[in-house]
């Protein structure tokens, strides 16, 4: 097995000689695969050492003739040619005499996107075969850098130079080009979370966007709820339409809270409760207008408003996000440092005998500075506990509500404890009293680091809680302030690598935010989020091992572990977590589950009914291929004459659908 296949050996094993279209594979000729395994595996393609591969990368040259390659291409192979070689020339990609310096690129998918290399390269201007389509070119002279064409059932893709050490430093959209040329993707996930801010989507067709989110693998939307805390009639109607559109697509909708920012109206109405910075200005920092929630009157009024907000709309959950203190500059910038309201100053002075405001006057006693920073972190934990109690009281009226806490990571970048007052070791023990997802937010300080940080972050949380299934990771897809290349914002292969690695390190991946994900990335996003640890192929039988469940391209009836499997939409067979065998066969069920936002543990078509076992931290929207006539939950008849979409309770349940 070549060296790169050995490196991937821990992730998967392919066996058998027959490879179906549902399991696209790749092979890189030679012993130096470069970054191609990182690129191709980021959307689920599987490496194979021998036998027919769907994608073959030739980096330098090939002992096989161009004629033999053309024959394989006609039969369905996608051949990738890297740089200058005799083989590339035989396919019409020929270097010319003119040479140019390349540093800025233009891609057909995002012509206005700035794609810049960290170091310019001098290279020839290539002549292309007449049938080739240019995907990426040098921005100013238009010299082709990535091009390809379809031939028979297959295709040829040519890149002018290697894609870089990590696979995304030069050409962010190589996978998109391969997809355009007919490369199939093997797996899909439907478990992503995404954050949503209506101020960026005021005039959109919410039904259209809900379908698009579902197709991109989004299972839940975290909606900026502060806009609706004291919203007008138009805002209220918008939110109702948004929630309804998402529910029709079996997408959950969470109220995303950003306390201590309550709302614009709350800030204007209560200047007496505004948080203060360490220079005693009102704490209006970036877009957030912070409120002193330590003040009992302010807390009572804000909690009353939050209760009304949650009870007035058909939310599926609540996300208590970023409930700690500014700023990422910590005490080095008093103008952004919080909290410094009168209540906090008085409380800390009672505890430590010093007004914390004096700690910003040099020289400050180091032990008092340390005491205040630790007090600040414990205060954040205290407020989280208070607000969880509020949400639990609301959940007694709405027992289907799911809960989440989003908190910036302080384990990988340990400075965060002192900068923001966030401490996972204080917050995670709350899981002993409350059921919630703990969503770890990527700190801005490490946005420039690669995807390998996610397994490292996950490892740092293992000692903190035995409830590893409650951990999730939030990837910030935004423009980064660091010097990064080739794009300021993660897109293409870089984004897919981040999502792919994160999905293997954590049970749940969230993206901030849906508006920032560039349109070219949406069709492949669900594939990047699909985690598969092992796949075996033996004739018509495919064995798949997935930690979280996965969808595979499929049409027609299927047997899962030898039994008729009823969880399938028009193009995807949805396989539960664990190790399972799949093969065509059996009678097509008269009724199928097409969408299901819970965790399917087992499902059987009996010939008359679907017998289903599932679990979910939120209520479940289950869309069927035809209307159900009867529903039983845990042996109790619930209803008859149901439609094609039914709502099931949170928790663990056994369901019969007829």
State the predicted function of each range.
Residues 23-93, 211:
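Helical hinge/lid and interdomain linker segments adjacent to catalytic or ligand-binding clefts
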Residues 24, 38, 42, 77, ...:
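A glycine-centered loop/beta-turn motif at secondary-structure junctions
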Residues 35, 81, 162, 174-177, ...:
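Non-catalytic C-terminal accessory domains or segments of carbohydrate-active enzymes
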Residues 43-48, 203-229, 312-313, 429-439, ...:
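Catalytic domains of carbohydrate-active enzymes, especially glycoside hydrolases
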Residues 84-147, 151:
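An acidic, glycine-rich "communication" segment
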Residues 431-531, 536:
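Substrate-binding cleft of secreted/luminal carbohydrate-active enzymes
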């Amino acid at each position: 097995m070549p060296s790169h296949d050995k490196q991937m050996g821990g992730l998967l094993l392919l066996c058998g000689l027959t490879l179906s279209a549902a399991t696209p594979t790749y092979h890189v000729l030679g012993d130096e695969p470069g970054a191609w395994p990182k690129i191709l595996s980021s959307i689920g393609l599987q490496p194979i050492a021998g036998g027919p591969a769907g994608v073959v990368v030739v980096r330098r040259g090939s002992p096989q003739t161009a004629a033999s390659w053309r024959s394989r291409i006609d039969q369905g192979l996608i051949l990738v040619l890297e740089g200058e070689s005799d083989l590339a020339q035989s396919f019409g990609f020929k270097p010319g005499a003119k040479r140019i310096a390349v540093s800025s690129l233009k891609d057909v998918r995002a012509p206005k996107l700035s794609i810049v290399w960290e170091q310019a390269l001098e290279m020839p201007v290539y002549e292309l075969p007449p049938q080739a389509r240019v995907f990426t070119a040098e921005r100013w002279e238009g010299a082709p850098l990535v091009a390809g064409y379809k031939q028979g059932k297959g295709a040829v893709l040519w890149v002018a130079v290697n894609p870089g050490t990590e696979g995304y430093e030069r050409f962010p959209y190589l996978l998109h080009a391969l997809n355009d040329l007919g490369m199939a993707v093997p797996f899909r996930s439907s478990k992503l979370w995404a954050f949503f801010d209506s101020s960026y989507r005021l005039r959109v067709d919410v039904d259209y966007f809900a379908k698009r989110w579902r197709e991109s693998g989004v299972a839940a939307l975290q909606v900026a709820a502060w806009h609706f805390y004291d919203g007008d009639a138009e805002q209220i109607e918008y939110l109702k339409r948004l929630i309804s559109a998402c529910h029709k697509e079996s997408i959950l909708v969470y109220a995303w809270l950003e306390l201590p920012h309550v709302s614009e109206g709350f800030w204007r109405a209560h200047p007496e409760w505004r948080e203060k910075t360490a220079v005693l200005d009102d704490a209006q920092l970036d877009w957030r207008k912070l409120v002193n929630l330590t003040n009992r009157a302010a807390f009572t009024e804000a909690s009353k408003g939050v209760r009304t907000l949650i009870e007035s709309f058909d939310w599926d959950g609540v996300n208590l996000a970023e409930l700690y203190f500014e700023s990422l500059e910590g005490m080095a910038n008093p103008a952004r440092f919080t909290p410094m309201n009168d209540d906090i100053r008085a409380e800390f002075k009672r505890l430590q005998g010093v007004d914390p405001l004096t700690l910003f006057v040099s020289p400050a006693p180091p032990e008092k500075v340390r005491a205040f920073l630790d007090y600040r972190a414990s205060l954040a934990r205290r407020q989280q506990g208070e607000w969880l109690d509020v949400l639990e009281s609301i959940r007694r009226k709405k027992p289907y509500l799911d809960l989440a806490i989003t908190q910036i990571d302080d384990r990988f970048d340990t400075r965060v404890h002192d900068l923001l007052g966030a401490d996972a070791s204080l917050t995670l023990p709350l899981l002993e009293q409350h059921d919630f997802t703990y969503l770890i937010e990527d700190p801005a300080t490490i946005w420039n680091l690669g995807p390998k940080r996610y397994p490292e972050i996950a490892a740092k949380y293992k000692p903190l809680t035995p409830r590893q299934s409650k951990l999730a990771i939030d990837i910030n897809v935004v423009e980064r302030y660091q010097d990064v290349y080739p794009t300021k914002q993660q897109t293409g292969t870089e984004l897919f690598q981040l999502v792919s690695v994160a999905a293997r390190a954590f049970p749940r991946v969230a993206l901030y935010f849906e508006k920032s994900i560039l349109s070219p990335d949406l069709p492949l996003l669900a594939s990047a989020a699909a985690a598969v640890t092992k796949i075996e192929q033996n004739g018509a039988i495919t064995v798949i091992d997935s930690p979280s469940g996965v969808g595979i391209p499929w049409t027609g009836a299927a047997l899962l572990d030898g039994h008729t499997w009823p969880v399938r939409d028009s193009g995807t067979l949805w396989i539960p977590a664990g190790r399972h065998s799949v093969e065509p066969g059996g009678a097509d069920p008269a009724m199928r589950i097409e969408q299901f936002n819970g965790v399917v543990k087992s499902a059987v078509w009996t010939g008359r009914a679907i017998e289903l076992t599932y679990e979910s931290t939120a209520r479940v929207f289950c869309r069927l291929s035809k209307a159900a006539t009867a529903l039983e939950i845990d042996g109790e008849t619930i209803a008859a004459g149901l439609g094609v979409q039914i709502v099931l309770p949170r928790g663990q349940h056994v369901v019969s659908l007829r």
